[in-house]
């Protein structure tokens, strides 16, 4: 197509709610056609995620198995050694990932760990993969150091709407999250930020969450949309599963609001059929996580993902070197 839809940072809530209330077929057709204006047809970005520090997090996020506030079956582990991380990076590349993400169950980045983090970034770049870190809140000075080390992306999800947020987490504020996102942006690192569906939020909360992301100074380049995986021992262990159609519609609305962003099917794919995942990809999702585990929750098998992408005639994206 020769006519491109301009990106916007001035969305209004009533506009987004109107999209959510659009007939399903009309909505996903609109999002699909818009997706084709900005991305190669049938191309899917592949990320791999490794937990470098498991459990013992001081935050009280009610969905999380790694929170020290809840009694789950998770065993607390110390920082992974560099050699184990190197092997994980090489395995991810072998499996076809173009981005390697690493996460730690921390409230915030600690200055004493920056050298270790920068060593991980070096390992990722040495394998010609994009790098992404998810390490909690981050100051501007820390973000600048990570940028100088070659970090491509920093993940910091907002989880839900500002209104619903106190029902999810009380140990850090919504503004804390937005401050970190601003620090990441000011440091020149690409933002990865999204949310979780199935926390008990309303459609309006989903609209407000996407409104916050779409009206940032710059749209997040990656927007992970997670489906809650209920964890035994957490306050949300008995939450009802979000309706499949509602999930797909959220993907479609995210695509329309942020047409140049990679919309990622993140946690919860194990509960999705191939047909549902195919509809999500049609509606505008164009990124997935490869690997048997996402932090502490099971993920789709790599072979199953390859088979699905093959059935759909999809191809994987080549890495982009933002800090080469």
Swiss-Prot record:
[4Fe-4S] cluster binds at residues 57, 61, 64. Keywords: 2Fe-2S, 4Fe-4S, Biotin biosynthesis, Iron, Iron-sulfur, Metal-binding, S-adenosyl-L-methionine, Transferase. GO terms for molecular function: 2 iron, 2 sulfur cluster binding; 4 iron, 4 sulfur cluster binding; biotin synthase activity; iron ion binding. One of its GO terms (biological process) is biotin biosynthetic process. It comes from the Bacteria. CDD domains: Radical_SAM. InterPro entries: Aldolase_TIM, BATS_dom, Biotin_synth/BioAB, Biotin_synthase, Elp3/MiaA/NifB-like_rSAM, rSAM. Binds 1 [4Fe-4S] cluster. The cluster is coordinated with 3 cysteines and an exchangeable S-adenosyl-L-methionine. Its EC number is 2.8.1.6. SMART domains: BATS, Elp3. Pathway: Cofactor biosynthesis; biotin biosynthesis; biotin from 7,8-diaminononanoate: step 2/2. PANTHER family: BIOTIN SYNTHASE, BIOTIN SYNTHASE, MITOCHONDRIAL. Belongs to the radical SAM superfamily. Biotin synthase family. Homodimer. This is Biotin synthase.
């Amino acid at each position: 197509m020769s006519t491109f839809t301009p990106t916007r940072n001035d969305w209004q809530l009533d506009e987004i709610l109107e999209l959510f209330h659009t007939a399903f077929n009309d909505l996903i057709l609109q999002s699909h056609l818009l997706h084709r204006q900005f991305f190669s047809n049938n191309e899917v970005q592949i990320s791999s995620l490794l937990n470098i520090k498991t459990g013992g997090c001081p935050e009280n996020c009610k969905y999380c198995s790694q929170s020290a506030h809840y009694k789950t079956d998770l065993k607390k582990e110390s920082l992974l050694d560099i050699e184990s991380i190197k092997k994980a990076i090489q395995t991810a590349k072998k499996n076809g990932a173009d981005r390697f993400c690493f996460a730690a169950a921390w409230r915030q980045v600690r200055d004493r760990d920056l050298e270790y983090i920068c060593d991980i970034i070096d390992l990722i770049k040495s394998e010609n993969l994009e790098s992404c870190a998810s390490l909690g809140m981050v100051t501007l000075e820390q973000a600048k150091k990570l940028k100088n080390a070659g970090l491509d992306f920093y993940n910091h999800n907002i989880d839900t709407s500002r209104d619903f947020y106190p029902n999810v987490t009380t140990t850090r504020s919504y503004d804390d999250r937005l401050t970190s996102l601003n620090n990441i942006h000011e440091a020149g690192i690409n933002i990865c930020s999204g949310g979780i569906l199935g926390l008990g939020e309303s459609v309006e909360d989903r609209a407000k969450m996407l409104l916050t992301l779409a009206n940032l100074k710059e749209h997040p380049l990656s927007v992970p949309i997670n489906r809650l995986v209920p964890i035994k021992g957490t306050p949300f262990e008995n939450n009802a599963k979000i309706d499949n159609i509602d999930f797909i519609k959220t993907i479609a609305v995210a695509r329309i609001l942020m047409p140049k962003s990679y919309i990622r099917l993140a946690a919860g794919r194990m509960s999705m059929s191939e047909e549902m995942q195919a509809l999500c990809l049609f509606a505008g999702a164009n990124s997935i996580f490869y690997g048997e585990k996402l932090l502490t929750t099971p993920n789709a098998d790599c072979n199953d993902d390859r088979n699905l992408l093959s059935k759909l005639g999809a191809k994987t994206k080549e890495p982009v070197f933002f800090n080469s």
